[in-house]
Design a protein with these regions (language model features):
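Fe-S-dependent hydro-lyases/dehydratases of central metabolism
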Residues: 1-257
Length: 257
């Protein structure tokens, strides 16, 4: 029996499998944000070291008011502390940090694709349920908890159990003014807000193929609203064209591979 896209990527990243079915999974990319500031403090208190600084990327977005341009614009309090701690952790540990004054700054799940951090065939995690957004580029992506954030930082791995597989094939064509958001809401209406519980959903079919990359990201983002662990879309020429030339995308012979 053949494997799904998700299963192929998963199996390539399994380091060890326990008798209970849980596996130690290698993580290619770790996105983090300001609400992990307590994880950074605990990480430091436990005397741990960031294993692979070049594979962690920090983006302050959860506590940043839309009107704030710099940290000084955020009122004193926990929100400001969260942003400050992320910046301090990045400087101390040496991981990439897209600060509020960086032109590349934005929402963590948008920065990843825009910068080429998110690429087909990778595993990517972040301490946020909507990490599934990145699956639109053909990678395995899922949210993790605060303790798991520390585990990934220390080992570049995480313990997980492989989800069940579900494929949703969407036929027909998008009508005028109909977006990816409408499509995924229609899917959730059909399968319910718990219909994807325990599954990784692969979205496919002509409607998905016709969507922009941003539309695909919206669909995968909201797989969580169907209860799914993750969403994924097989990469195609549109995906490759989107990734081409971005800062962290391969170049030269590496791109040709």
């Amino acid at each position: 029996m053949g494997k799904t896209l998700f299963e192929n990527i998963w199996d390539e990243h399994v380091i060890y499998e326990r008798e209970d079915g849980d596996v130690l999974l290698y993580i290619d990319r770790h996105m983090t944000h300001d609400l992990h500031f307590r994880s950074f403090a605990a990480f430091k208190e436990n005397g741990l070291t960031l294993r692979e600084p070049d594979k962690t990327f920090g983006v302050p977005d959860h506590s940043v008011p839309t009107t704030a341009k710099t940290i000084d614009d955020i009122p004193e309090g926990e929100m400001r502390t969260a942003v400050e701690v992320l910046a301090e952790a990045a400087e101390e540990m040496g991981f990439t940090h897209y600060s509020m004054t960086d032109d590349r700054h934005g929402i963590v799940h948008v920065v990843g694709p825009e910068q080429g951090i998110t690429l087909p065939g990778l595993t990517l995690v972040c301490g946020d349920s909507h990490t599934s957004t990145h699956g639109a580029l053909g990678c395995i992506s899922f949210g993790i908890g605060s303790t798991e954030v520390q585990h990934v930082m220390a080992t570049q791995t995480v313990w997980q159990r492989k989800p069940k597989m579900m494929r949703i094939n969407i036929t027909g064509k998008l009508g005028f003014g109909v977006s990816g958001k409408d499509v995924i809401l229609a899917v959730i209406r059909e399968i319910s807000a718990a219909g994807g519980t325990g599954y990784a959903i692969e979205f496919a079919g002509p409607v998905i193929e016709a969507m922009s990359m941003e539309g695909r990201m919206t669909v995968c983002n909201m797989a969580i609203e169907a209860g799914a662990r993750s969403g994924i879309i097989a990469p195609d020429e549109k995906t490759i064209e989107y990734c081409k030339g971005r800062p962290y995308s391969p170049t030269g012979t590496e791109w040709d591979k």
